[in-house]
Amino acid sequence: MRRLTRRLALPIFGVLWITVLLFFWVTKRKLEVPLGPEVQTPKPSDADWDDLWEQFDERRYLNAKKWRVGDDPYKLYAFNQRESERISSNRAVPDTRHKRCSLLVYCTDLPPTSIIITFHNEARSTLLRTIRSVLNRTPMHLIQEIILVDDFSNDPEDCKQLIKLPKVKCLRNNERQGLVRSRMRGADIAQGTTLTFLDSHCEVNRDWLQPLLHRVKEDYTRVVCPVIDIINLDTFNYIESASELRGGFDWSLHFQWEQLSLEQKALRLDPTEPIRTPIIAGGLFVIDKAWFDYLGKYDVDMDIWGGENFEISFRVWMCGGGLEIIPCSRVGHVFRKKHPYVFPDGNANTYIKNTKRTAEVWMDEYKQYYYAARPFALERPFGNIENRLNLRKNLHCQTFKWNLENVYPELRVPPDSSIQKGNIRQRQKCLESQKQKKQEILRLSPCAKVKGDGAKSQVWAFTYTQQIIQEELCLSVVTLFPGAPVVLALCKNGDERQLWTKTGARIEHIASHLCLDTDMFGDSTEDGKEVVVNPCESSLMSQHWDIVSS
């Protein structure tokens, strides 16, 4: 009997031990959620979403600011408000990704991100559609929060009412701060380990966030952007953009989209591969929060809007990071032809201040080409940059020459950066810009004898780009035919209507081979006040001009 007991003891003990282990394993499974990369937060069902949205009275929110029949639908927001309000906030958009994007697999443990959206007097329909597209097309476990920063809009309720929506928080500035300082405020309270900046008139596309977060998780020094599709400002149709584009710029620090070169396209074996970009558009990107803080966040002394994308792009590349456009991430954006809001110091002055700060801190000796392209920036105040210069020094950043050689070798360095600046005289009179009925016109006026606003309207700059500039405006012909008026138009590099050369005493328009003339009737009288182009004739005094340095 004792032998039998001894024989059975070991098996019984083993069974009991296994039973205990099973009990604790099952109990633990009931009490704990498994941790690690296998965790998946289920997306709410359609019914759950309906319950969440029932707490928010969408119709009441939109109707409070609805377009009224008889009003100009473009007046308030510089896009078709009537059409925007006609479209559902929950509309479907076409999947514009390459078909191979749907085959890609991303990390299962991507970190949740803080989505920061700043706005000033945004249309409620576009703001709501931006948020709803994010909630509809983003796994909920990847959204830490959606931080709205209301930059002192006229109606605080534009933002306040939206906190009823899932994940949404609302901050309001007590005075107008502009894009940079508003984004900084959102970033400072963000709880996510990554920051996702969006504009307030966007619609994100399918699986837009995962490829962005995946690249940042692989390398925290990457700053990544989606391909930006177009939402038509008139019809609000969602239009696919070309995927093989990158951001570029000229020496005036004007952003421009550019096609990849044939060589760059040939090296792309996979259409889903990230695209290195010298600069980002600045409205939509993802960055690691700790990296953002380490790099110095934004230059908070930049005002309202414009130029901040150059500053952060130069800083990222020159201080150890990189910029990428991710083809499998798509976000639609309403591109407007003008700003619907007011710049306290004027659009041009604000942009020059911001880009001048960028040039002075980051462009080293190459800033001379910025001033050659924007000669009137030399006189503009730009604030104190000591903190930003110290930041660059402490980060041990590369030179701008390194940036040109390694990041953007396609940007040609001009052979000459000299500027000829002064009055354009014809005998005792000077070429002058005058405002009439909200338009800038040209005429000959007595030359100003003292400095002041009157004198400034008679100062012109000849640049290496072969443009004749005053502030942000250039001399431009209306047509290429004799007798065509010469007007002031926004400068655009490479525009043949704005290219001139000084030949002896004449100022010749390059494309038409016509000369700047004040005698619109060709009779050499003193009565011709309109500035035109006519066939060049050395004997005509109305085509004789002297450039007198101011």
UniProtKB/Swiss-Prot annotation:
Membrane topology annotation: Single-pass type II membrane protein
Class of this enzyme: transferase
Binding residue positions for substrate: D151, R176, S200, W305, R336, H339, Y341
Topology Cytoplasmic: residue spans: 1-6
EC number: 2.4.1.41
Region (Catalytic subdomain B) residue spans: 274-336
GO-annotated molecular function: carbohydrate binding; metal ion binding; polypeptide N-acetylgalactosaminyltransferase activity
Keywords: Disulfide bond, Glycosyltransferase, Golgi apparatus, Lectin, Manganese, Membrane, Metal-binding, Signal-anchor, Transferase, Transmembrane, Transmembrane helix
TM ranges: 7-26
Disulfide bonds, paired cysteine numbers: C101-C328, C319-C397, C430-C447, C474-C491, C515-C536
Pathway connected to this protein: Protein modification; protein glycosylation
Residues covered by the Ricin B-type lectin domain: 415-548
SMART domains: RICIN
Similarity field: Belongs to the glycosyltransferase 2 family. GalNAc-T subfamily.
Protein's UniProt name: Polypeptide N-acetylgalactosaminyltransferase 14
Organism encoding this protein: Mus musculus
